[in-house]
Structures are given as C-alpha cells and as structure tokens.
Amino acid sequence: MVTIKKDFIPVSNDNRPGYAMAPAYITVHNTANTAKGADAKMHAKFVKNPNTSESWHFTVDDSVIYQHLPIDENGWHAGDGTNGTGNRKSIGIEICENADGDFEKATSNAQWLIRKLMKENNIPLNRVVPHKKWSGKECPRKLLDHWNSFLNGISSSDTPPKETSPSYPLPSGVIKLTSPYRKGTNILQLQKALAVLHFYPDKGAKNNGIDGVYGPKTANAVKRFQLMNGLTADGIYGPKTKAKLKSKLK
C-alpha cells in the first residue's frame, strides 16, 4: 500500500503563495524528468528550494506519494497565469518518469490518489484534466495519447493509499503570554502547526513570524484559531487547543 508523506513547502517560499483554494479540478502532469533517482523524494526536495518558482500539490512515484501543499492552498503549476483557473482552482499532481522507476506503477498510484481526492472534494471525473487543458503544453506527455484509458483506470481504482499522520508534533502543557516571552522548540512546533492551517503569527514577516517566541502575535494566532474552531478564545494554548489542532492536522 502506497504511503502519502506530507512534506510541505516552507510558508516563506515565494512558490507557496498561500492563496485560499476550494479545489474544483485535478490537473495531471508528468515530471518530464527521466534521470535516474528523479523520484518523488527528489522532487520534494526540489520544490522546497527557495529558488524554485513552480509548485504543485503531490508528486507520485512507484512506491510513495509526497504532498507539498495543503489542498486548500493554490500552487503555480498550470501555466495559465496568476488568476487562471488551473493555478487557482486545481490540485496539481506530478507523476514521476525516472528511468529507474516503474512508470506503470506510478501511474496506478496516481489513479488511486486522484480517486481519493475526488471523493474528499466532490470533484467529478470530467474535471480530472491534463495540464494541456490550461496552457496548451504537451503534458502529461506519456498519458495524452491514451487519456481516456487513464481516466477509466481512475474509475476502477477504489482502494485509496494509506495516509500517514502529519509530521507536525505538538507541545504538551499550557503555553501563554508571559513576561519575558517564552522561547524554545515547543513554541516553534506550535507556530509551525498554526502556520500549516493558515493561522500565521505574522504573515508577510520573515518566515511568517515563525521564530520560536510566544509573543503577542503568536498568542493572537492561537486566539484566532480558537475563535474559528469553537474554543474559548483566550490565546492560551492548552490540552483542548492541542486536541483541536491535532484533529485539523490529520
């Protein structure tokens, strides 16, 4: 059973624009990289590079799936401009074609993933589209000639992959605003978890305010999260806030 690994692009990267997205389409790509070792893990490393301008949601190879963005954020993968439907309303999936991999298995894994995403986001099969739809690029180059067969494979792929738990550990205990401000790894863990859910300590600042310090802006991010999730909005992180964060990070 293939595993989905969440390995998100840092929120500070330019290729993680952070625009909210309600996905209406799923866009399929081939990586067009046949080099040995050009698997999902390598592409996960590439897309996190601060100098990379493109971004997409998933990369699939013959043994694993890497997720690079939350599906409620857009990526830059469709080539139809800043406000294009492909970029702003579609989940981007890259299928690896590395020479030392099994492309047919990677394609099968992608079909399972697409089926899963269709169910979770109420996306019909006729909105699973090739990259070519948005920009005219001959992509996914290895699937275009038998696109209908690829779609038929999605319809018959009813066993979705196993998804791993998110890699965002949460601190225990109670954390609140104090003087002097509390600092440490536990604060950093909390800030990263909040940022993944779009409750940034200081969006637009360096690393969106993720600095390991529980100051007023981080307390405000906690308060905003609590307010939006039916908790007492006091800006104090405790067991109830931890439990709610954990449920949202699944």
UniProtKB/Swiss-Prot annotation:
Sorted alphabetically, which Pfam families does this protein's record hold? Amidase_2, PG_binding_1
Domain N-acetylmuramoyl-L-alanine amidase: start-end pairs: 45-141
Q: Which Gene3D superfamilies match?
A: Peptidoglycan recognition protein-like, PGBD-like superfamily/PGBD
Q: Which UniProt keywords apply?
A: Cell wall biogenesis/degradation, Competence, Hydrolase, Secreted, Signal, Sporulation
Keyword Ligase: yes or no? Answer: no
> Cellular component GO terms, alphabetically?
extracellular region
Coiled coil spans: none
Question: What's the main place this protein lives?
Answer: secreted
Q: Where found in the cell? A: Secreted
Reaction(s) this enzyme catalyzes, per UniProt: Hydrolyzes the link between N-acetylmuramoyl residues and L-amino acid residues in certain cell-wall glycopeptides
The EC number(s) given in the record are 3.5.1.28
Q: Which family does it belong to?
A: Belongs to the N-acetylmuramoyl-L-alanine amidase 2 family.
> What this chain does, per the record?
Autolysins are involved in some important biological processes such as cell separation, cell-wall turnover, competence for genetic transformation, formation of the flagella and sporulation. Could play a role in mother cell lysis with CwlC.
Q: What is the official name of this protein in its record?
A: N-acetylmuramoyl-L-alanine amidase CwlH
Organism name? Bacillus subtilis (strain 168)
